[in-house]
A protein has these predicted regions:
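Conserved N-terminal helical subregion
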Residues: 4-5, 74-158
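N-terminal Rossmann-like FAD-binding beta1-loop-alpha1 element of flavoenzymes
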Residues: 4-33
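Anionic group-transfer/hydrolysis microenvironments
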Residues: 9, 37, 111
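Glycine-rich FAD pyrophosphate-binding loop
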Residues: 25-50
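N-terminal FAD cofactor-binding segment of flavoenzymes
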Residues: 46-86
Length: 158
């Protein structure tokens, strides 16, 4: 078993884990990203053909991560939102023009978001991709947390 020290381990290379890894690029941290599936869009269950509504805050995060330019080409702007309940006289209507923004949010395919994130991961300077691999055990010791990782080829690291 090989011993490797990381400042931070991210378990899961889905949208949240991959976004976190991208956001921490350039920090003075040695980061490992553990993912059970191969890091390809077709292999990852989270990067499927579902469409997701992205808030303006998410767009700003993707912009900061230098991903929005790639996603903007296929994302559909949400310009109006109508909220009502069947049988109830009340409703709410939101319009991007009233808010002074280009869009209230965007609709994008999970597969395309995944493709943008996965294309960026190998370029990160301080993130080591540990995949396909799975977290085996976690032990808390006085000065560190020890984690055993098993790769698909049965190699292990601690």
């Amino acid at each position: 078993m090989n011993n490797v020290d990381y400042d931070l381990l991210i378990v899961g290379g889905g949208m949240v884990g991959a976004s976190l890894a991208c956001a921490l690029d350039g920090q003075d941290l040695r980061i490992g990203l553990i993912e059970a599936a191969p890091l390809t869009v077709s292999a990852h269950p989270g990067y499927d053909d579902r469409t997701l509504a992205l808030a303006q805050g998410t767009r700003r995060i993707f912009q900061t991560l230098d991903l929005w330019e790639t996603l903007a080409a296929t994302a559909t702007p949400i310009r109006q939102i109508h909220i009502s309940e069947r049988g109830s006289p009340g409703f709410a209507h939101l319009d991007c023009r009233d808010e002074g923004v280009e869009a209230l949010g965007y609709v994008a395919e999970a597969r395309l978001i995944g493709a943008a994130l996965l294309a960026k991961l190998p370029t990160l300077r301080n993130v080591e991709l540990l995949c396909p691999a799975r977290l085996e055990t976690v032990r808390i010791e006085p000065d560190a947390a020890c984690i055993d990782v098993r790769f698909a080829d049965e190699r292990t690291v601690e």
